Amino acid sequence: MINISFPDGSIKQFAKNITAYEVANAISMSLAKAAMVAEINGELQDLSIVIDNDCKLRILTAKDPECLEIIRHDAAHLTAEAVKELFPETQVTIGPAIENGYYYDFARDTPFTTDDLAVIEAKMQELSQKNEQVTRELWDRDKAVEFFKSIGEHYKAEIIASIPAGEPITLYRQGNFIDLCRGPHAPSTGVVKHFKLMKVAGAYWRGDSRNEMLQRIYGTAWATKEQLDSYLLMLEEAEKRDHRKLGRELDLFHFQEEAQGMVFWHDKGWSIYNTIEQYIRKKIRKNGYTEVKTPVLVDKSLWEASGHWEKFRDDMFALETDDKTLALKPMNCPCHVQIFKQGIKSYRDLPLRMSEFGLCHRNEASGALHGLMRVRSLVQDDAHIFCAAEQITDETVSFCKLLTEVYKDFGFTDIKVKFSDRPEIRAGSNEVWDKAENALKEAVEQAGFTYTLNPGEGAFYGPKLEFVLTDAIGRQWQCGTLQMDFVLPERLDASYVAASGEKKRPVMLHRAILGSLERFIGILIEEYAGRFPLWLAPVQVAIATITSDLNDYALEVQKALIDNGVRTDFNISPDKINYKIREFSNQKIPMIAVIGKQEQKNKQVAIRRLGTTDQEVLSVEQLIAVVKEENEKYL
């Protein structure tokens, strides 16, 4: 007999060689019917797994969040099965679960069409309703390679041949379809009920542009119809808010082929950019940061010394000149260390908080570029804190508070923290890592955050915090980071004189709040759906005259607003007032100042705020005061 421990703390005895499914059935038939996979000693397994030793067991159903990835992986296999039934000449390659769904890559001569997706999805529904049994099989490597070659699946044969010797070769069979997979999977295809195929895109085999182009079908799958419908509704709303679409409509920026991944900022977009930079500059000055500016083009010797040349060379833009290799900086940290090293630093100089709106360049693949969200030229609200080990907690607490203030000012209050601890391969002793991790954990708790752990996901040079925002339609964006670094000060020979007189290495905290300004502006455009708050809007007040004989007064009002730092636009054309109001509303300008004869007579304006038909009559001085008060809160 074996002892099986359950999540409620109970321990029950069962005969050896019992399957997880049989245990579930012994507990209740309803549990066995709903069961998808088993968690045995913390590891997810198929329900068919044979249990022959004492263990901790948890039976998972579709209600458990861990099963969402299983459902999506199952949906990927279901997609491949449907494609093979409909288009048998197609070769299958790989199909993992990803955030919000899955994809499967196929090799075929004829591209899939939108009509094909509808047919494939219908076939998937049919296969789901068949509720085909899914079984796991262990195969001999050579036999598996020969089998897939014999049925024309050469990509699968190549994958199997590349699996290290000694690793098991597991295949999963459902109906007439068989696929290479580690698993686990649910026991039948019927668990995949709520799904939709989204689009087809190109993808290179093994992600290498030198290889052949495959066709990638993207899909989404959920545990319930309500979840699927909610997700599709969110996508519909996201499409309306797409920053690329709004960027064109609101005349904020554009991209073009001659400068891929580089933003052409228009005056209104550049206004938003500069306002955010001004806001951040005020915040960091209040929090004891100095601001610096470092070169964009730096000799490769510095990147070699820092380790970036070895690690990021393929992502860097480099050029040869005067027998030297220069590189556009992909990040600011090595340059900040050079400033720290100018002159002798004492423990009294620490913590030293050094910030920069640093222009960086990264050679992103053209296929990865995505509007403002993924660019090749970017400016980071970057800072590095040089401190002693005993100052880590206080500095992290201060940073968390600053970050919270900033996010709140932009309207983000739902902030999640991810904590990435030591990886297997790392620099520094366990004692150093213990102290570093404990310092960050203590700081996060002091700042009032809870965190989720990403085990082993820290950099080799130190643990990391990531700050994730949730936007108005429920999407999550990782923006802020705080990365501890024991290694770069050592590599670049940064030191300070301790109170004892000995030379010590500072700890370096890499931190950013917004990430890149480009990406954060993209997030804000979608968060606000283009309706920027008054202090941030590129045009704060638009002036519209009812008749042309009021134009002189309108120009007086505009001059008064501009003289007081209010960003304005005006329309004194002979167009009808309703047209002018509609046009300014479409441009999502927060305040429209309507001028009629009464307003001219009383030296006033009638203010209509975006999204309302109500009007509020103000003197020009009152209007200026309203805008100034809002600006001064943030700027």
Curated annotation (Swiss-Prot):
Keyword Transferase: no
Domain of life assignment: Bacteria
A GO biological process held by the record: threonyl-tRNA aminoacylation
Catalytic activity: tRNA(Thr) + L-threonine + ATP = L-threonyl-tRNA(Thr) + AMP + diphosphate + H(+)
Entry's Gene Ontology cellular component terms: cytoplasm
Function according to Swiss-Prot or TrEMBL: Catalyzes the attachment of threonine to tRNA(Thr) in a two-step reaction: L-threonine is first activated by ATP to form Thr-AMP and then transferred to the acceptor end of tRNA(Thr). Also edits incorrectly charged L-seryl-tRNA(Thr).
Family to which the UniProt record says this protein belongs: Belongs to the class-II aminoacyl-tRNA synthetase family.
Protein name per Swiss-Prot or TrEMBL: Threonine--tRNA ligase
Provenance organism: Rickettsia peacockii (strain Rustic)
Lineage: Bacteria, Pseudomonadati, Pseudomonadota, Alphaproteobacteria, Rickettsiales
